Structures are given as C-alpha cells and as structure tokens.
Amino acid sequence: MSASVKCGACAKTAYPLESVVANNNSYHKGCFKCSTCNSTLNVKTFKSFEGKLYCPVHTPKVSATAVTDSVALKNALNAPKKVAEGLGNAHRGLDEKPNIGLDSMATANALNAPKKVVEGLGNVQKGIGGKPTYAVFGADGQPTGEQQEQQQYTEEQYEQPQEEQQYQEEQQQYQEEEQQYQEEEQQYQEEEQQYEEEQ
C-alpha cells in the first residue's frame, strides 16, 4: 500500500480521490478554504502566501519598507557619483570666440552690397524742407526776401511736366471713382426704396 498523505490544514490522512493538491500539499476538499473568510476555494481561485491559503480578495499585499540603517541603503548613499571623465575642462568647438557683430562676414557683405535705386523717387520731395513761413508783407505790400525765395522755389517745383501730368491723371481717376461710387450709392437707395414700397 502507498504511504498515506496528510492534509495540509487538519493533518489527517487525505486520500487521493478525496483531496486537492496545491502548493506541494494535499488538502481535503472541505479543508481547502481561505484562512481569512473561510470561503471554499478551488485550484483556479486559491492564492498561497507564507504557507497559508487565501482567496483573491484577501491575499495579503507584499510591500517593501525602507529601513534607514539597512546595508543596501547605506551602500547606495555612499556609492561614488557618476562623473563623465574630462567634462569639467572640456571645450566645445574652437578656442576662439565666434565673430558675431559688425565684424562678421555676413554683416560686412550686407553693408557693402550695392544699394537699390527706386525709379521715380529722385525728384520727389514732400513739403518744402524748411521751417514753415508766414506771409508777412512789408509796409510797401511786397513780400520779403525769404518769402520771394519760397515763392520761386514753389513755382519751380510745379514746372516739372511729368509730375504735373501724373497728378492730373490721378486727379481724373479719383473723380471717376467718386462718380462711380455716387452712382452705385444712388442705385442702392433706389433699390432700397423699391423694396420698402413692396413691403
């Protein structure tokens, strides 16, 4: 006959047909229970912890505790810090500073580049270029010397035929646009009036 196997819970003989084998122990089917809630377990639902049986709900959680005087913690704190060799005195790039500023090549090239000349701006002047003058006539009713120079300068500016022609063309175009705007405004008012009459 075979040697009798003892139950892991009650220490009585557990026959093979009446027992459950779990965690290298044999248990009676009635003894195979959770040690916390005494619910009956099966091979699929049991959990074993420190030689005791538990259901999945009551299985104790393993948590590590930090002990400040443990050898592993002391070794970790006293371990040498990782230092890359030679980084303290390392230079990146060349030993000289970069030339950024007015002496750089890009700046020098930009300053020495030929300037663009915009067509038609050579003779354009806004205003008279000096202080504003007031028309003060002398006792004889004639303009003073400074006022005569100003009048002569103004006459010279309007003697330029191209600018005068361009000014007249722009003035004519403006008048045409103004007339078109007025016609559109009148048409809009007529349509609005017609709409109100229909209502």
Swiss-Prot record:
Q: What is this protein called?
A: LIM domain-containing protein E
Biased composition regions of type Low complexity, renumbered to the chain: 146-155, 163-174
Gene for this chain: limE
Swiss-Prot/TrEMBL keywords: Cell cycle, Cell projection, Cytoplasm, Cytoskeleton, LIM domain, Metal-binding, Nucleus, Zinc
Q: Which PANTHER family match?
A: OS06G0237300 PROTEIN (PTHR24206)
Q: Which Gene Ontology cellular component terms are annotated?
A: actin cytoskeleton; cortical actin cytoskeleton; extracellular matrix; filopodium; lamellipodium; nucleus; plasma membrane; pseudopodium
Q: Which GO terms describe its molecular function?
A: actin filament binding; metal ion binding
Question: Residues annotated as region Disordered?
Answer: 134-199
Q: Which Pfam families match?
A: LIM
Q: Tell me, in one coarse class, where this protein mainly resides.
A: cytoplasm
Q: Which GO terms describe its biological process?
A: actin filament bundle assembly; chemotaxis to cAMP
**Cited function:** Associates with the actin cytoskeleton and may regulate actin polymerization in lamellipodia, through a rac1-dependent signaling pathway. May play a role in cell motility. Involved in cytokinesis by regulating the microtubule system and linking it to the cortical actin network.
Species annotation: Dictyostelium discoideum
Deletion consequences = Cells exhibit longer microtubules than normal. During mitosis, interphase microtubules and the spindle persist far longer than in wild-type cells.
